[in-house]
């Protein structure tokens, strides 16, 4: 096993521990708590893949971080912070909407890269809106936290979420996943809209109805594949 992989995991475990202590003191805001929960699942998946104990890794990570801080000057720390581009966190959903449990009468699921697409194919002829919480950097979608499809009544009928065992996705990955979800929902006669944030960052082109248009390749494929894909 590569030593950098192990040490990276150890440092991530310790930094998560520090953030958890911060949250336990009721100091974290909603985006902070969202990332904390997401990263916890990711660390558990990585621990299983690497065959490492999280508690032991956390202690080792603490030693690594302490050694770095001992060598770091205040001036170097200021320069490092200033050189890191800041990302923005955009929220369409409340914490309650993100954490709410939901179930499907006719569940369908598709894994697309590191994203999992789920929808309830029992939902027909409804007006649906897609909402998402995600970060943006350099005016591009950086990381999708969670996307959910809601009916006008507030019921959750679809979802796109990162697979924590396969970290990493691009804005194009999200765009394609949204296209698959929209195609699956529309197949059953539903009308789908997306939030303004998604229109701006997940789709660059729109049709005359102000709904994101599918990429040409997906327009050809959705009708023939969505029933088996989603």
Swiss-Prot record:
Post-translational modification: Upon interferon induction, ISGylated via host HERC5; this results in the impairment of NS1 interaction with RNA targets due to its inability to form homodimers and to interact with host EIF2AK2/PKR.
Statement: the UniProt record of this protein carries the keyword NAD: no
Gene3D superfamilies hit by this protein: Influenza virus non-structural protein, effector domain, S15/NS1, RNA-binding
Location of the protein in the cell: Host nucleus; Host cytoplasm
Keyword annotations from UniProtKB, A to Z: Eukaryotic host gene expression shutoff by virus, Host cytoplasm, Host gene expression shutoff by virus, Host mRNA suppression by virus, Host nucleus, Host-virus interaction, Inhibition of host innate immune response by virus, Inhibition of host interferon signaling pathway by virus, Inhibition of host PKR by virus, Inhibition of host pre-mRNA processing by virus, Inhibition of host RIG-I by virus, Inhibition of host RLR pathway by virus, Interferon antiviral system evasion, RNA-binding, Ubl conjugation, Viral immunoevasion
Region (RNA-binding and homodimerization): 1-73
Single biological process term from Gene Ontology: symbiont-mediated suppression of host type I interferon-mediated signaling pathway
Stretch list, region Disordered: 206-230
Record protein name field: Non-structural protein 1
Species annotation: Influenza A virus (strain A/Swine/Iowa/15/1930 H1N1)
Gene giving rise to this polypeptide: NS
